[in-house]
Amino acid sequence: MKRRIALCIAVSLCAGVYAGNNPGIYKKGWIDFNKNGVKDIYEDPSAPIEARVQDLLSQMTLEEKTCQMATLYGSGRVLKDSLPTEKWKDEIWKDGIANIDEQANGLGRFGSSLSYPYVNSVENRQTIQRWFVEQTRLGIPVDFTNEGIRGLCHDRATMFPAQCGQGATWNKELISEIAQVTAEEAKALGYTNIYSPILDIAQDP
């Protein structure tokens, strides 16, 4: 849980770019994530990470902590809406969720309308991020995850051989180059956590 909260804090350092429907929470040098008008320890970028984590944990309910251990599958699967709606206030993620997986990657029922042009993919996740920062009780940013087992799981990303094929090469330098391309494309599109391939699956009972 602490690692998860620390990641949220790291993501929050970039959250200023998401200013939108609740501009009053964006202060000079910090964000009022819990909308109480006070700079709490977890909202103070200059405070030690451990202190910020402890402060945030102390303010979280059991339900909020539980949701920070859950994945919401995006792109029209579990997450049926392409963008936040009023109904989100009544959903299980109304006060946050750990991560949304494969959002706006061109797969699922929304298809390529959200994945290309690339700006559509980025803006979709930024809009969703604004909702979590501005509309949830503690404003904990969401982690946008994606698969990276044969390149980034995005219909316009570079595709590589399947993970078994990569592992069969026994070529560490080549795998490193594949990982570098995957990482650069994921970063450019705003994905913050990528699942790596299982290269030894043929030998793993």
Regions found by a protein language model. Give the residues of each.
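A periodicity- and composition-biased signal for non-globular, repetitive helical segments
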Residues: 8-10, 71
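Sec-dependent signal peptide recognition
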Residues: 2-8
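Intrinsically disordered, low-complexity sequence elements enriched in Ser/Thr/Gly/Pro
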Residues: 1-2, 63
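N-terminal beta-rich core of secreted/periplasmic extracellular enzymes
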Residues: 20-205
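Short, intrinsically disordered/low-complexity patches at protein termini
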Residues: 3, 15, 199-200
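Hydrophobic h-region of N-terminal signal peptides that target proteins for export
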Residues: 11-19
